[in-house]
């Protein structure tokens, strides 16, 4: 989760933060991201799409313990959840897997899942300090083709990453600009040959965020300085 940024803001943050989140994984250091196949069982992450809009900020362990914000702050018209109870223990379990991959100890900060709908995009941005080491996990979708997540590498190339359900893209959230182009709309023909937009399409993913235990952002553990 990040506030919308201008391109100038993104460029400034990239220049300011590049090289500040060192790990022991050579490929991760070179590219600023890493695809982790089969990171988690997508069935354990699945939640039914209800075609809602807005943002639910959870404060308790029950699914009815949340505050609803009618307008999602980053992707207008989407439906997102901050600290949904279903993912609470998974957040820590995934952290243990990522620590082995990067060779560094991590602290949990927060997690955030979002249902995107056709026509919606994630504008280019770099993340706030609590998202130093992050992973975006594809949960489920019912669209025709895999929808890519884009990321800019430290050497200036824009890479397109397509994930299967359960796969994750591990990335340096504060350092590497990332985005999604609009989720394509799909159409069907009626009995009369009229082209109409398909309804009920979605793409669901979850971000799990962490900070390096020995890094300059360690005090953001638990998302305590948001």
Write out the residue ranges for each language-model feature.
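Short, Lys/Arg- and Gly-enriched loop/turn segments at beta-strand edges
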Residues: 177-186
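Conserved double-stranded beta-helix
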Residues: 74, 80, 91-148
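Non-heme Fe(II)/2-oxoglutarate
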Residues: 1-102
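A structural signal for short, well-ordered beta-strand segments and their strand-loop junctions
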Residues: 35-37, 107-109, 170-171, 207
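A short, polar/charged loop/turn motif at coil->beta-strand junctions and beta-hairpin connectors
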Residues: 27-30, 107, 202
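Active-site loop architecture of trypsin-fold serine endopeptidases
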Residues: 183, 195-198
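Intrinsically disordered, low-complexity domain-flanking/linker segments in eukaryotic proteins
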Residues: 187-195
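Catalytic core of non-heme Fe(II) oxygenases with the double-stranded beta-helix
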Residues: 118-176, 193, 200-206, 211-225
